[in-house]
Amino acid sequence: MESTLSASNMQDPSSSPLEKCLGSANGNGDLDSEEGSSLEETGFNWGEYLEETGASAAPHTSFKHVEISIQSNFQPGMKLEVANKNNPDTYWVATIITTCGQLLLLRYCGYGEDRRADFWCDVVIADLHPVGWCTQNNKVLMPPDAIKEKYTDWTEFLIRDLTGSRTAPANLLEGPLRGKGPIDLITVGSLIELQDSQNPFQYWIVSVIENVGGRLRLRYVGLEDTESYDQWLFYLDYRLRPVGWCQENKYRMDPPSEIYPLKMASEWKCTLEKSLIDAAKFPLPMEVFKDHADLRSHFFTVGMKLETVNMCEPFYISPASVTKVFNNHFFQVTIDDLRPEPSKLSMLCHADSLGILPVQWCLKNGVSLTPPKGYSGQDFDWADYHKQHGAQEAPPFCFRNTSFSRGFTKNMKLEAVNPRNPGELCVASVVSVKGRLMWLHLEGLQTPVPEVIVDVESMDIFPVGWCEANSYPLTAPHKTVSQKKRKIAVVQPEKQLPPTVPVKKIPHDLCLFPHLDTTGTVNGKYCCPQLFINHRCFSGPYLNKGRIAELPQSVGPGKCVLVLKEVLSMIINAAYKPGRVLRELQLVEDPHWNFQEETLKAKYRGKTYRAVVKIVRTSDQVANFCRRVCAKLECCPNLFSPVLISENCPENCSIHTKTKYTYYYGKRKKISKPPIGESNPDSGHPKPARRRKRRKSIFVQKKRRSSAVDFTAGSGEESEEEDADAMDDDTASEETGSELRDDQTDTSSAEVPSARPRRAVTLRSGSEPVRRPPPERTRRGRGAPAASSAEEGEKCPPTKPEGTEDTKQEEEERLVLESNPLEWTVTDVVRFIKLTDCAPLAKIFQEQDIDGQALLLLTLPTVQECMELKLGPAIKLCHQIERVKVAFYAQYAN
């Protein structure tokens, strides 16, 4: 029985038809990165692992295929047309000097070797076009002013400069492919032609099922209902060609022999016709194949002997023979088998196939050569073998350079494909390097395998962090130092905790931390104590108190990063706006922390948001980290901490407990409270506002949030409590109100309108019977009449004020909402903005997915920060937002 495989089976630039296998016999078990990978389950971290093992990561430059995959499709020397900086209505031809991702370094033609005017631009947002675009669109081509006098005839200069040059591809400068790299162009569903593993002149179309950083999971068309024959190949594999290539070269388009019996010939024909039509409709850009290496001619002849890595079991090197030559590019190599009924294993090779070696290579490099099956001697000897079989050795010049190691050395770490389970990538260690071959130890496998032999240019090996960068599971080692205890992030129900625990007051400048018993633990400094969710503590404006109460009372003990990541995930899910909390957590950092970056997710309204958050790694920083997070979320610093709070919180946060919304709706409660966890000797005694505190006042306004978000948390009593708390917070910033009025920077404040005196100049509502102050009066005291008028404006029907002109203007600005802003979609928000004098900003709302609830949360600082608006337009926009808020409270707050 003879089986034939492609030489790419041996992890070569032609990498191999490897089947994906995770939990299924055929090697195609599904991997759901959303459900969590082994990285998440074990909390494996490359940084800690390298630190604890004392190993180093293989250099990124050693992975040739990965380096190529992240290169831009734009090449130095390409020409394009770009808008002039000083005169954007005109354009000029520029040359690409270098690239960095989607950034291009350009130089206007005419500057020669002068680099002083070089400039960077982003392909996605810059005004770039292919050469010839200006002529087609009647645009003006004009050289920059700095070199305008350098030549008298610029037309002649351009003709001379552009002759023989390459223009940047139009499809990469315009349309959906703009700025995308080669691997980004390959999408799920893309169709490609795949060379048969047995016959170099036969192809069949495959569909891309997954694209993991250029590593493609491929499925033959016609086999959509089964994954048994799926293969994994890197997109640079020579066996992959654009659809139509086979026909152009007059090769056969037939399904492989192993799948042909699965369907009738007529069915295969219909499948092919449909695939060709689909491929013509959505062709794969040719830029995907621009880095494919051209195959050089080989010099092998039938009967030549060589040594080769066993393609089915890449753990051994065996004697082999050239058994067939197809043409000057392809030949067949078969592993020698001396048994009477040999089971021949063959592979398709080309001149640069990986894993084929000259005779005596193993002897020269001190590597064991596995004798052929049926060989009678004890130790294999090529001299005796030649005498017995009279074979000819393949001359050394037939092989590529066999001594190039690409910088790999012993004990380096990397990520590698499990040859018995090609859908699985593992942590791997370089055991030894011989010439251009490496022996890898794969860690963490359920069924251990011998050391895997791979070429240094294999496309089945990847640098440290590649899986994480591509959101793909990585099989971690079974026992790393940091994982000595497998009970990580144990979530304990409340009933398992003792009923009462002594409580000590936590000083604001100290972090109380339980004693860690690290007996028997090599890695105690990375062990986090039990963290408690003290749901009785004040939850602040971001978090839903009801959802907090539903969380388990404790998490841990376990590895610091994993425990804290679990706690932060729970906190995010307990938020009114998970995405907003995620954004706040991004800002928590300290230069003195020993941290690592972790990706956290927030799901809201069917969308998933991701952000990188810094999490401390060592136990001595956990308490400080918890307090910093709580401070950022404006909640009690003991909301989650290493200390269990049974009854009374040491921070006395009960004074901030959320009470009935109706209580504040009808009454004016004047208190001035500092943020929790910060000492303020004057707490509870409002002080007159002072001008020099304006900067601080803006910060306070930024930190206050609208109670509008609280309505999304649920209904009934809980919702009312959340609203009341938000309003209570608003009164705390009252002392800064008059400062802000002076420069009108609180236009966007998201406070409840009835909870503070309004600024009649810019925040007018049709229901507010407040007279506009005289123009020369820049400051207004916060007397009781102003406060009561604000309340009455919310509670009572509008009464006619004395100033009829002011009333008329207020009536004009009064907004009547047809629907509740809390229920507005992004489209509704965009539609509203377009009806205002801020219509040009509607695009920003569309791009940032701002719905009604998010709209009600916007404040002047957030508008300036997130929308990158100057003060004038920001105030103008915030005035419109304030109109919505006023109308919301007037129409829907009841």
Curated annotation (Swiss-Prot):
It comes from the Eukaryota. The gene is SFMBT2. Transcriptional repressor of HOXB13 gene. One of its GO terms (biological process) is negative regulation of DNA-templated transcription. Residues 1-39, 672-813 are annotated as: Disordered. GO terms for molecular function: chromatin binding; histone binding; transcription corepressor activity. This is Scm-like with four MBT domains protein 2. It comes from Homo sapiens. Interacts with YY1. Interacts with methylated histones H3K9me2 and H4K20me2, but not with H3K4me2, nor H3K9Ac.
